[in-house]
Design a protein with these regions (language model features):
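Short loop/helix-cap segments at secondary-structure boundaries that form the rim of catalytic
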Residues: 120-126
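Short, flexible helix/strand-to-coil boundary loops that buttress conserved ligand/catalytic motifs
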Residues: 13, 23, 50, 88-91, ...
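Short, well-structured N-terminal submotif of metal-dependent ribonuclease cores
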Residues: 1-38, 52-67, 109, 118
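Glycine-rich, flexible loop/turn motifs
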Residues: 15, 51, 73, 97, ...
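Active-site neighborhoods of divalent-metal-dependent phosphate/nucleic-acid chemistry enzymes
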Residues: 56-62, 70-116, 129
Length: 130
């Protein structure tokens, strides 16, 4: 399975040229195999970016989110008690709570994470692709 972080999700939907060729290949392969996901907190992050006018989805927000999910048949993974607890372990030193949840989600599900975030690439227990 592959988990996309919020930026990778946005890039895939709106600006695919911002993805690296490797990230795009991994996303496409995972999508074809039905093994692509995101954390539910990414939907909230996108909503916040739209509310703050830092992202223009080009459509009504709810419809945009549904379209993003349907375009790749994304599995939206919930924050479970295990993921919440894992996100607070010492291995996650990232200051952004959403990034902690997203990386803990990938780790919990034994998934690769698609992310350009250099801090997340330093997590030795997590395979980060970019």
């Amino acid at each position: 399975m592959v988990v996309l972080d919020t930026n990778a999700l946005i890039y895939d939907a709106l600006q695919p040229k911002r993805l690296t060729p490797l990230a795009l290949r991994v996303i496409e392969a995972a999508s074809e195999n039905g093994e692509i996901a995101c954390s539910d907190i990414s939907l909230w992050e996108i909503a916040m970016l739209v509310a703050k006018k830092r992202l223009d989805p080009g459509a009504e927000l709810t419809q945009f989110l549904h379209d993003v999910i349907q375009a790749r048949a994304l599995r939206v993974l919930p924050i479970t008690p295990e993921i919440a607890a894992l996100s607070q372990s010492r291995q996650f030193s990232h200051g952004d709570p959403a990034d902690r949840i997203i990386s803990a989600t990938a780790l919990y599900h034994h998934a690769r994470l698609i992310s350009a975030d250099i801090k997340l690439r330093k997590l030795t227990a997590l395979e980060v692709v970019w």
